């Protein structure tokens, strides 16, 4: 069912060369032209950090790979806002990962379904699709 989706960092990484790691139903939904799919600046930041720490092998540095791939998929950028940052104070402290917590707040603020394999997201008041 087409809708508005926000990609967690993991599926964003998977779609950059490990597409088979994303379930077929998820790939189909994201490819539906009626679906609006966002990626967050937060994920770009997380990918860059992991790459610099040597924890994320890529064919080239993220600044060269990501813009090309994001354009290929037609995903839209969701900027980090002050409202999202301050929204962290209203989020239960179930999970400590700052990137994930900001993505949860962004999904709530935009009414987006969060696309993620991370089961901990189910403990938050956000809809998750995987």
Residue ranges and their predicted role:
Residues 8-10, 47, 88, 107:
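Generic structural signal for small/hydrophobic residues in well-ordered secondary structure
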Residues 59-67, 71-117:
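Active-site neighborhoods of divalent-metal-dependent phosphate/nucleic-acid chemistry enzymes
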Residues 3, 46, 84:
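Short, basic/glycine-rich phosphate-binding loops at helix/coil junctions
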Residues 125-130:
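Active-site regions of enzymes building and remodeling cell-envelope glycoconjugates
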């Amino acid at each position: 069912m087409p809708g508005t989706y926000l990609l967690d960092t993991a599926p964003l990484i998977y779609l950059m060369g490990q597409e088979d790691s994303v379930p077929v139903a998820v790939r189909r939904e994201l490819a539906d032209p009626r679906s609006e799919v966002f990626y967050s600046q937060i994920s770009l930041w997380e990918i860059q950090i992991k790459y610099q720490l040597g924890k994320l092998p890529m064919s080239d540095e993220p600044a060269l790979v990501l813009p090309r791939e994001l354009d290929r998929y037609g995903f839209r950028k969701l900027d980090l806002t002050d409202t999202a940052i301050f929204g962290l104070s209203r989020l239960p402290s179930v999970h400590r990962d700052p990137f994930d917590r900001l993505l949860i707040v962004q999904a709530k603020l935009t009414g987006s379904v969060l696309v993620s394999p991370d089961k901990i997201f189910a403990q938050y008041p956000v809809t998750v699709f995987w």
